[in-house]
Amino acid sequence: MIVTLTFSPAIDYVVDLKHLEKGAVNRSQGEHCMSGGKGINVSIVLANLGRKSIATGFLGGFTGDYIKGELQKRGIESGFVQVEGNTRINVKLRGEEETAINGQGPHISDAQIEELMVFLETLTKEDLLVISGTVPSSLPSDIYEKILARIENQHVQLIVDATGDILLNTLKYHPLLVKPNQEELEEMFHTLIHNEEELIENAKKLLNLGASNVIVSLGGDGALLVGKGLEPLHLQAPKGKVVNTVGAGDSLVAGFIDEYVQSGNIASAFKKGIATGSASAFSEGLATREEVEALLQMMD
């Protein structure tokens, strides 16, 4: 079973404008809603690739019901804890520039955190948990570490997509995969990286601290894989026009998982991850199976 955990899901309400005039009535040229959140993105892309998952975290109110409905349409099982108040709405205004207004989100009680913990304690070594994203102010800042300590004895396979001290504090729980970008790697180790040799050297520090595999995202230059027992592997991203980078990193994680669950081969999973992340970057929405397969053929 694959489980994705999103602490602070949202509805992204995207409004297209020719021009945003402050202090005046603006007419939209179009608008649409999307279920947002890093773990939710992973579940949606997995569903697009034909892979089932359970999405969990915290949802509330009519906005939470909307997200549950959207996930259900895609065949994604909901394991969310119900909270008081409404799941947040993020407003994204797209015109000559993009302006975002992110909602605050509902209060989460200790009892609701415990309810999530009890659900996660049902996972076993056969399961894979994706834990990702920022920690909202309504949760303890060390919630990642609290969760992983609670389920440590279950030997669940872990993928952690976080940054800074949050990521560093999870490494003792030996995640299967972590996925910083170069800038995040530099910030974690208080250094500047000038070449691939230094990139590999710093990625290996994460291995030494407990990670099994590290993928360093390099934007248009693809990504670097460093893993225990593996030679470092740098793959270029396939060529294409970048339309939207939102969800591209989550899509990389989904592509990696889909192939890893299928074959157990880390290098193949890395390749599919890059293809899947690129497919999302090259489209308005999240990657589809057909888009990913086309890019994989380009990478052969």
Each model region followed by its residue ranges:
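Glycine-rich phosphate/adenosyl-contacting loop at the front of the ribokinase-like
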Residues: 1-56, 64-66
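Conserved phosphate/ATP/ADP-binding segment of small-molecule kinases
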Residues: 145-230
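Conserved phosphate-binding/catalytic region of the ribokinase-like
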Residues: 168, 196-300
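Conserved N-terminal subdomain of the carbohydrate kinase-like
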Residues: 48-127, 295-300
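Charged helix-capping and loop-helix junction motifs
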Residues: 114-117, 141-148, 194-200, 235-238
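Short, small-residue-enriched loops and turns at beta-alpha junctions
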Residues: 107-109, 135-139, 166-168, 187, ...
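Short beta-strands and strand-loop turn motifs
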Residues: 100-102, 126-133, 161, 179-184
